[in-house]
């Protein structure tokens, strides 16, 4: 039987070949002091972050950017308006409380749809159920 030349072809689909243990071991970072740094899974880091922010009471949106936003919106409605610092603080607290509640409802909508990732449609549904316009 005669030999024929085989030309290289592009592969479409299928599983990628697994990386060997040598390449995985070479990728690990070893600190100078000799101890191997434990790397946490992304899901456990996310859960740790959720617990941290649920325990805390400090505001999550920075003060100065929020203040600039409030002043910018107020300038469009009524120029030369002044704010007391207590008024901006009250607006800040109210805005964060609203956002936290909205994200909680959005998360419930995502869970109801048997998902763990929130999507814009979850937020739209949460706002519609709340009866908000806009």
Swiss-Prot record:
GO CC terms, sorted: nucleosome; nucleus
Q: Where in the cell is it found?
A: Nucleus; Chromosome
Q: Which SUPFAM superfamilies match?
A: Histone-fold
Residues carrying N6-acetyllysine: 5, 10, 15, 24
Q: Where is the signal peptide?
A: none
Name positions with the PTM N6-methylated lysine. Answer: 5, 10, 28, 37
Task: Report what the Swiss-Prot or TrEMBL entry states about this protein's PTMs.
Answer: Acetylation is generally linked to gene activation.
Q: Which Pfam families match?
A: Histone (PF00125)
Residue numbers of Phosphoserine PTMs: 11
**GO molecular function: any one?**
protein heterodimerization activity
Query: Which keywords label this protein?
Result: Acetylation, Chromosome, DNA-binding, Methylation, Nucleosome core, Nucleus, Phosphoprotein
Region (Disordered) residue ranges read: 1-25
> Chief location of this protein?
nucleus
Its quaternary organisation is: The nucleosome is a histone octamer containing two molecules each of H2A, H2B, H3 and H4 assembled in one H3-H4 heterotetramer and two H2A-H2B heterodimers. The octamer wraps approximately 147 bp of DNA.
The entry's family comment says: Belongs to the histone H3 family.
Q: Which PANTHER family match?
A: HISTONE H3 (PTHR11426)
Q: What does this protein do?
A: Putative variant histone H3 which may replace conventional H3 in a subset of nucleosomes. Nucleosomes wrap and compact DNA into chromatin, limiting DNA accessibility to the cellular machineries which require DNA as a template. Histones thereby play a central role in transcription regulation, DNA repair, DNA replication and chromosomal stability. DNA accessibility is regulated via a complex set of post-translational modifications of histones, also called histone code, and nucleosome remodeling.
Q: What is this protein called?
A: Histone H3.3-like type 1
Which species expresses this protein natively?
A: Caenorhabditis elegans
Gene name in the database record: his-70
